[in-house]
């Protein structure tokens, strides 16, 4: 699958304000500072499509991007990161509700990509989030990020730890990919996966609906 264009569409404060289009949505989420924006930029081939920041927890809203290929149109959705402890309890609860409402209520959500920093050993909050999504029947994929920042042995050990732990909860393990925004590792594999679960959707129809929603 080759991406022709990728553009910012809109920002939504909650799922009820999300654009009413027929475009399938592929949402990306992870702990704060996991490299989510960098991964989205790498996938789309647009360096500044999703705003990156050295400060964790900068994404506070639901960001929608329209992606067009030669035959299909879909949306990439950048969700706020979870697990940023420096927020007030009220802000944390607001973000948790925003994230949960989108994941559980958004009919256009086709797949949830959960990002994991491959440099780190398994984090409890990531495991709990993956299992929560699985328990609610959400189609999901695990994406290990920052593969260029760690040696092969450490990378393989961390992935093995994850697969072993998940097998305690999952009868069938979710798909997983290893990526690097710096080297574009995993880009082709991720795009091929998205293409494989993305049925033919009219580019014209999706774009027209998105524009009508903006008007």
Task: Please state what every model-predicted region is.
Residues 19, 87-88, 123-126, 153-155, ...:
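Short, well-ordered secondary-structure micro-motifs
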Residues 69-109:
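Conserved nucleotide-sensing/catalytic segment adjacent to the nucleotide-binding pocket
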Residues 43-44, 103, 194:
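Hydrophobic aliphatic residues
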Residues 3-16, 150-207:
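Canonical P-loop GTPase G-domain recognition
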Residues 1-86, 203-215:
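Conserved G1/Walker A P-loop phosphate-binding module
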Residues 59, 92-96, 127, 184-187:
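Amphipathic alpha-helical transducer elements in NTP-driven molecular machines
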Residues 58, 81-83, 119-121, 146-151, ...:
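Conserved nucleotide-binding/hydrolysis micro-motifs of P-loop NTPases
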Residues 97-173:
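Conserved C-terminal guanine-recognition region of P-loop GTPase G domains, centered on the G4
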């Amino acid at each position: 699958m080759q991406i022709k264009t990728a553009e910012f569409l809109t920002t939504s404060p909650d799922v009820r304000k999300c654009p009413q289009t027929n475009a399938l949505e592929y949402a990306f989420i992870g702990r704060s500072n996991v490299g989510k924006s960098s991964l989205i930029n790498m996938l789309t081939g647009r360096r500044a499509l999703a705003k990156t920041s050295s400060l964790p927890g900068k994404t506070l809203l639901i960001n929608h991007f329209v992606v067009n290929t030669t035959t299909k149109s879909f949306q990439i959705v950048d969700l706020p990161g979870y697990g940023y402890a420096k927020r007030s309890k009220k802000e944390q609860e607001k973000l948790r509700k925003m994230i949960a409402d989108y994941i559980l209520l958004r009919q256009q959500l086709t797949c949830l990509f959960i990002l994991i920093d491959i440099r780190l050993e398994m984090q409890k909050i990531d495991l709990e989030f993956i299992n929560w999504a699985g328990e609610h029947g959400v189609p999901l994929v695990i994406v290990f990020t920052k593969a260029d920042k760690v040696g092969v042995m450490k990378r393989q050990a961390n992935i093995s730890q994850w697969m072993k732990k998940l097998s305690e909860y999952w009868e069938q393990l979710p798909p997983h990919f290893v990526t690097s925004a710096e080297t574009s590792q995993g880009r082709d594999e991720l795009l091929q996966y998205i293409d494989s679960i993305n049925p033919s959707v009219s580019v014209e129809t999706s774009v027209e609906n998105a524009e009508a929603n903006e008007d």
